[in-house]
Curated annotation (Swiss-Prot):
Its EC number is 2.7.7.6. Its main location: cytoplasm. This is DNA-directed RNA polymerase subunit Rpo1N. Residues 306-349 are annotated as: Disordered. The lineage of its organism: Archaea, Methanobacteriati, Methanobacteriota, Stenosarchaea group, Halobacteria. It comes from Halococcus morrhuae (Micrococcus morrhuae). It comes from the Archaea. Part of the RNA polymerase complex. The keyword Lipid biosynthesis does not apply. DNA-dependent RNA polymerase (RNAP) catalyzes the transcription of DNA into RNA using the four ribonucleoside triphosphates as substrates. Forms the clamp head domain.
Length: 349
């Protein structure tokens, strides 16, 4: 029993799905609860079989029912668009109230912040809530069988934020965590007056990707997108270099039979592996789902010695030498009744 990414309870009893939906949290590459439990209780071999079976089942389901996504899957009703427009108007009014309070020197600064920083922070919070509100409105008008919603909620691809930006509102564009302030002297673009502090003058994109961005919104969006591209390139190079240094530094370390970690010169790096002599792979990540070692041992022993008809689910021990000898014995022709082989003598024509 565990909780899925959508907050629903997933319960599996004796291999049968009793409650909930299987999503990325159940069989995902990182932190899949079902796969993790199978590895700990039944071994890696059974987990590999399970992953292959799930992949085959998913492919058969997609081939049978079909799954596709198009531009119409991000469309919302006129009533939803009217609600979103009303939410945006309320956000603009709230931002203008903050600006008026700031210009009248009535805005109180937050602890540890200047008045200017307080204004920017409150405007960002207001516009963020407006985008979230637009996303909630759009989400209410999407059907449960919408392909985009299925992908987002199952964790297959994308998120509800991506769906919000496609259908409702892209939201505030940020550079270095702040509203866009760079551009011309005293203003971001020549389309705005100097000193304009409004939402649209500092990178707020009201439109959605489906409805299309205005030229000014597109320019601000490109500024935010450029930061993402540069950050991705820099982060990749830094993390790659860090990984290379770690590999070079740790490549000579190995765990000895006495539990210590040593290098090739037999210098002790750790008296116990990980300071607790415990493999993280075999440790439960949840206090609610502790590993019952006694139950696993009883089940394995029962399967091995009591019921010979039950297939052992764990990893079978193999002896490569014996396996090769058996294969050679099977392939070697029998000597009983075999026809004699003529071997020519040296010198015969």
């Amino acid at each position: 029993e565990f909780t899925s990414s959508t907050g629903d309870t997933v319960m599996i009893d004796e291999g049968a799905l009793v409650e909930g939906t299987i999503d990325e949290d159940a069989v995902g590459a990182f932190g899949g609860e079902i796969v993790d439990t199978i590895v700990k209780q039944y071994g890696e071999t059974r987990a590999r079989v399970f992953i292959n079976e799930v992949a085959s089942l998913a492919m058969r389901a997609i081939m049978h029912f079909g799954f596709s996504i198009g531009i119409d899957d991000e469309s919302i009703s006129d009533a939803a668009e009217a609600q979103i427009d009303e939410s945006m108007d309320n956000a603009y009014e709230r931002v203008q109230e903050l600006i008026d309070t700031y210009e009248n020197d009535d805005l109180e600064s937050l602890p540890g912040r200047t008045v200017d920083e307080t204004l920017e922070m409150k405007i960002m919070q207001t516009l963020g809530k407006a985008r979230d509100s637009a996303g909630d409105i759009a989400d209410e008008h999407f059907d449960d069988d919408n392909p985009a919603v299925i992908m987002a909620e199952s964790g297959a691809r994308g998120s509800m934020l991506n769906l919000t930006q496609m259908a409702a509102c892209v939201g505030q564009q940020a550079v270095r965590g702040e509203r866009i302030n760079r551009g011309y002297e005293g203003r971001t673009l020549s389309h705005f007056k100097p000193g304009d502090l409004s939402a649209e003058a500092h990178g707020f994109v009201e439109d959605s990707y489906r409805s299309g961005l205005t030229p000014r919104e597109f320019f601000f969006h490109a500024m935010g997108g450029r930061e993402g591209l540069v950050d991705t390139a820099v982060r990749t190079s830094k993390s790659g270099y860090l990984q290379r240094r770690l590999i070079n530094a740790l490549s000579e370390l190995e765990t000895q039979y006495d539990g210590t970690v040593r290098d090739t010169s037999d210098n002790i790096v750790q008296f116990e592996f990980g300071e607790d002599n415990t493999s993280p792979v075999k440790v439960s990540s949840s206090d609610d789902n502790e590993i019952d070692v006694d139950e696993i041992a009883d089940r394995v022993l029962a399967a091995e010695f009591e019921d010979e008809g039950e297939e052992f689910a764990g990893e079978q021990a193999t002896n490569l030498s014996e396996s090769a000898d058996d294969r050679m014995d099977r392939d070697r022709p029998s000597s009983h009744g075999a026809a004699p082989i003529d071997v020519p003598e040296v010198g015969d024509d």
